[in-house]
Amino acid sequence: MKRVGLIGWRGMVGSVLMQRMLEERDFDLIEPVFFTTSSVGGQGAIGKETVPLKDAYSIEELKSLDAIITCQGGDYTSEVFPKLRDAGWQGYWIDAASSLRMADDAVIVLDPVNRRVIDQSLDAGVKNYIGGNCTVSLMLMALGRLRGRPGRLDERHDLSGRFRAGAQNMRELIRQMGTINAAVAAEPADPASAILEIDRKGPETQRSAEFPVDHFGVPLAGSLIPYIDKELPNGQSREEWKGQAETNKILGRIKNPIPVDGICVRVGAMRCHSQALTIKLNKDVPIADIEGLISQHNPWVKLVPNHREASMQELSPAAITGTLTVPVGRLRKLNMGSQYLGAFTVGDQLLWGAAEPVRRMLLILLER
């Protein structure tokens, strides 16, 4: 039975990972060892025997493990991973953070899409397996069946949910919502109140010096933020750059990349990403054939008919938050020509966007 270290299991991604491992009884298959960066010796977590928490910075403790799953973040990875490898550790490093994604000796894991790449890498002795960018993973879960077949992705318009920026940002969004509500709460309940007065108070509150923007820097509630991550010299944001870079690494196509680009915008959804996609097909393919390819790709993708009511009920963050379902809808040919396809997809960024791929990577290791 493999000794598996778990680090960062108290955070949001780590908590979802723990929940999924409990639901699927994964802990029955391993000897879990829980680590902490702040509470060494404290009460342990789940397992066959609860033991005190171990020091996540102790190279000697970490060296005793067959595999490590970390959701602790990029700073931890950057500090500990090279020291651990330099100390001669030959175990498997499974990481939800982005630090190692583009490393030559690492594989981005999304097994419903790139199981062949994962298996080939395991056979070749690769030991580093990294969860992908949440929007990229969710896009490929939705449309991965089209790769190498009739389509390529030319544009990706990402509406990014709030957890992507962190738990403190999620709390700030809720505070922003509450602040706006408090400023106008009396007026909506009064039928005699002037709607323009309500309309004036909302933006006035957003622009006030007291509006909580410590984490976002600008209002998000009742607004949007048209930029995510760092600014790059070519005009892209780093989040937009990841679309092509990580997609092609996941698919094993770095030398023959599929072009992927788009505009990434932050909106006030809590833990989901929504993506409007424009896909250029290699040839004119009937919509029915495309629907068949998408719906057969994996057990979690859900094809939503391109009708108003179905779209409103099934194709939104409110409908799928907390589920593994990845709905795809609004499929239709675009006015630019019969080789252009429009689509819209939504996914939970804490499940398929973060925790589930690393959980499933552990199971792949356990199969060997």
UniProtKB/Swiss-Prot annotation:
The active site is at residues 134, 273. It is an enzyme of class 1 (oxidoreductase). InterPro entries: Asp-semialdehyde_DH_CS, Asp_ADH_gamma-type, Asp_semialdehyde_DH, NAD(P)-bd_dom_sf, Semialdehyde_DH_NAD-bd, Semialdhyde_DH_dimer_dom. The keyword NADP applies. Pfam families: Semialdhyde_dh, Semialdhyde_dhC. One of its GO terms (molecular function) is NADP binding. Signal peptide: none annotated. Keywords: Amino-acid biosynthesis, Diaminopimelate biosynthesis, Lysine biosynthesis, Methionine biosynthesis, NADP, Oxidoreductase, Threonine biosynthesis. Pathway: Amino-acid biosynthesis; L-lysine biosynthesis via DAP pathway; (S)-tetrahydrodipicolinate from L-aspartate: step 2/4; Amino-acid biosynthesis; L-methionine biosynthesis via de novo pathway; L-homoserine from L-aspartate: step 2/3; Amino-acid biosynthesis; L-threonine biosynthesis; L-threonine from L-aspartate: step 2/5. Substrate binds at residues 239, 266. NADP(+) binds at residues 10-13, 37-38, 72, 160-161, 191, 349. Disulfide bonds: none annotated. Its EC number is 1.2.1.11. It catalyses: L-aspartate 4-semialdehyde + phosphate + NADP(+) = 4-phospho-L-aspartate + NADPH + H(+). Coiled coil: none annotated. Homodimer. Belongs to the aspartate-semialdehyde dehydrogenase family. Catalyzes the NADPH-dependent formation of L-aspartate-semialdehyde (L-ASA) by the reductive dephosphorylation of L-aspartyl-4-phosphate. This is Aspartate-semialdehyde dehydrogenase. The lineage of its organism: Bacteria, Pseudomonadati, Pseudomonadota, Gammaproteobacteria, Pseudomonadales.
